[in-house]
Amino acid sequence: MPRFRPVFITVVVVAIVAAACGGSSADTTSTAGSEVVLGRGSIPQTVPESFPIPEEGVVGATLIDPARGITEMILTFPADTPAVVDYYEQNLPPRGYTIASSDGSETEWRIEFSDDAVDGVMSVQTGGSGVAAAAVQFTER
């Protein structure tokens, strides 16, 4: 099993539990002496404006690491993995993204994409009956 999968599963479970336990307000936390900003509940300002997020998508945990040029977020959807994958395969190219690869199974999928400013990877995984979660990472070029 690839090392990414257990980490992804842990992050998704923590994000879903945190979203369920938290209130409706967005929170951010930055560590003293560090530029890393952790948040939840709102799209990080460093996510490209052109990146599509469906209206029913819910933002969970987020991370901004300016020193490494990385932004990460967890999204949950009231849909199964194939529906989420279909949405992104249809909506990334018209917004200027090139899909480098898109491969997986009925319950987990990985999409690698890029535009002129970022390289991105999205790992989508079924989180339960009719629910999917996606870990999305953007790396500045």
Segment roles from a protein language model:
Residues P2-I9, V14-V17, G22-R141:
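An acidic-aromatic pocket/loop used at catalytic or ligand-binding sites
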